[in-house]
Structure formats: C-alpha cells, structure tokens
C-alpha cells in the first residue's frame, strides 16, 4: 500500500490530539494514490486482484472503458476502470483507473466508498454534478457498479483475458459481434464474425455443444449478445470482460526501442530500404501535386477514427492522400495495424 502525504498528515494530527489527552485511534489507510505519466494519469485505491489472490480472498473484477465525459461533447477522452469486489456481498475491495481526463475525481469516488466499507451497489447510486463537458448521464463509476451488479446477480457470466488466452482453441467458439468493418480491422485468431444486429437471424450457425465466448470492442455488445443467446436456450456462453480492448492491451508484446550507435543519420531506415528495393513500385507523386483529403475525427472514440479513415480511403482516387486528425490516443496504433 502507498502511505503518502494524506495519511501522514492525519497521523500527525492524531498524534497531537493524543498528546493533549484525546483518545483517537488511527483507522488505517486504503492506499489511495495517483501519478502523472507524461500525458496520462494512473490511479489506484484499495486492494488489487494480485493482493487479493495472495491473501486468499475470493473476489470478482469488472473492467470497463468509458469516456471522461459525454461522447457527443468535444474532447471526450477514453479511460479504463477496473474494480475488485466480493462475489457474494458486493463489497468493494479496490479500483484502478488509467486515463487522460477525469481520473482523479473517479478514483476519489471509489476511495470514499471503500473507506466506508461500501459495495458496488453504492457505486450505482453515485450522484455527481452532471453536464456534458464534465461527465455523462451515467457516470463511469456508476457504470462500473452496474457491470459488477450484473456479474453478481448472474445477468452475465464473464470470462477474463487470462482464462480465454489459456483455453485451447478446439474447446472454444469465439464469437465477435462487432460490425463487419470493425472485424476487418482485426480480431482474435479463429473468431467468427456475426454482427450483433444479425445475431437473432443467424443462431443456426452457432454450436450448442461448445462454450461460446462472446466479445466486442469494450464489452457492451458482447453482454447484449450473451443475453440474447441465453434467452434462446444457449447455456454454454460467457462474455469477455472488458472486450477486445482489454485482451489486446493485456497480451500485446512489450517493445523496447534501442538506439543503434553504429547507424548514422545518413543511413536509410528499414522502410526506405524496402521502398527503394521495389522494382515494380509506381513512381511517387510529388506531395505538392497530390490532392489532400483532410478528415476531422476529433472527439470520436475507438473504432470511430479508424472506420472514418477506412471509409475515406475507400473513396480515394489515384494520387490523392489523406490527412486525418484524431484525439483518440489509440488511433496511431490502430492505423498502423490496419495499414499492415
């Protein structure tokens, strides 16, 4: 746990009060902390899953990827929230948040509930100041509570990324319920794409003798697919907690870039070597002569920017180029993956 300035100052006051005759105990700390990492904010409070496993405490967790405020208002930024809680009572054990905006006030809300031994049901009742520039009608903390309540009450049966990764392919049926355009940008190996809007008409394509793992981008459509399937007699269904975004982030290889001291500034990059070695490559069109199509994708959340880029690219004429502006932090990675 992180005993930082806040607990230290409380301890100082308690010491002074007790010196003067008061009998005030120190109630302990739940280790709430926050840090700035370049333009991102990382925060934690309470007990994470790793500590709960070490203590032998049975728990569940939920992961969501909401926006910092209403998505239709400019400059909404993504954040990821994970909470841990008791399987039976719903008591909130801990929470971790990573994002760009609004992380501080959300971690404070979680810390307050944990400090007062509250539950995920208390998160559902959170009442905060709301206007589109500051939050959404359902605050991210409340959404975390709703998802946790769905798990406790059996409205969904989650599968976590570690479990899904370790299950042999022949023992699972991966159902990607995103749109065809999203699926074309990449999915889990072996996944079958049936968009959510088509699911009711294509249930005959699904096996009833194998476990079906539904997933989407962040979890919501996967949950809806889970509900549809279970209400139509499928009893072997689980939904990927946090969706494809969580799975990809957790399983992505860590790349360490190192400077090559022997390489001079004049040495061509690998990309330059590849391009120059292509004998059949068409002659490059001068940048000044190429028509530039400018696309504004600011404010859109994943997969909005990449789908907008794809739609623009599909309509390009020969020699035209695209210049796209986006605020979604994951867009450069998504664009590189799509181009490859």
Protein language model annotation of sequence segments:
Residues 275-340:
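Domain-level signature for proteins that mediate thiol-based redox and metal-cofactor handling
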Residues 83, 110-111, 164, 212, ...:
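Generic hydrophobic alpha-helical segments
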Residues 91, 207-211, 315-322:
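Short, surface-exposed connector motifs at secondary-structure boundaries
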């Amino acid at each position: 746990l992180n005993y930082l300035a806040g607990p230290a100052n409380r301890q100082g006051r308690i010491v002074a009060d007790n010196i003067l005759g008061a009998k005030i105990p120190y109630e302990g700390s739940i280790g709430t902390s926050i840090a700035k990492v370049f333009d991102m904010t990382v925060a934690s409070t309470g007990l994470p899953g790793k500590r709960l496993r070490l203590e032998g405490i049975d728990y569940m967790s939920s992961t969501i990827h909401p926006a910092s405020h209403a998505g239709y208002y400019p400059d909404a930024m993504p954040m990821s929230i994970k909470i841990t809680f008791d399987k039976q009572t719903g008591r909130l054990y801990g929470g971790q948040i990573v994002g760009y905006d609004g992380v501080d006030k959300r971690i404070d809300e979680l810390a307050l509930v944990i400090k007062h031994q509250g539950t995920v049901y208390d998160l559902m009742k959170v009442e905060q100041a709301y206007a589109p520039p500051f939050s959404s009608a359902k605050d991210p903390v409340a959404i975390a509570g709703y998802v946790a309540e769905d798990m406790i009450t059996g409205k969904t049966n989650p599968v976590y990324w570690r479990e899904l990764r370790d299950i042999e392919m022949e023992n699972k049926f991966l159902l990607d319920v995103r749109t065809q355009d999203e699926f074309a940008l990449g999915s889990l190996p072996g996944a079958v794409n049936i968009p959510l809007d088509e699911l009711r008409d294509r249930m005959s394509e699904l096996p009833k003798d194998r476990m079906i793992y539904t997933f989407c981008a962040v979890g919501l459509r996967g949950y809806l697919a889970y509900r549809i399937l279970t209400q139509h007699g499928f009893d072997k269904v689980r939904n990927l907690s946090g969706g494809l975004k969580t799975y990809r982030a957790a399983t992505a290889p860590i790349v360490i870039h190192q400077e090559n001291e022997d390489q001079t500034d004049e040495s061509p990059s690998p990309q330059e070597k590849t391009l120059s070695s292509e004998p059949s490559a068409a002659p490059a069109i001068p940048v000044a002569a190429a028509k530039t199509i400018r696309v504004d994708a600011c404010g859109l959340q994943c997969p909005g920017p990449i789908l907008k880029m794809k739609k623009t690219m599909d309509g390009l004429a020969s020699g035209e180029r695209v210049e796209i502006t986006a605020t979604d932090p994951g867009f450069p990675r998504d664009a590189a993956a799509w181009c490859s």
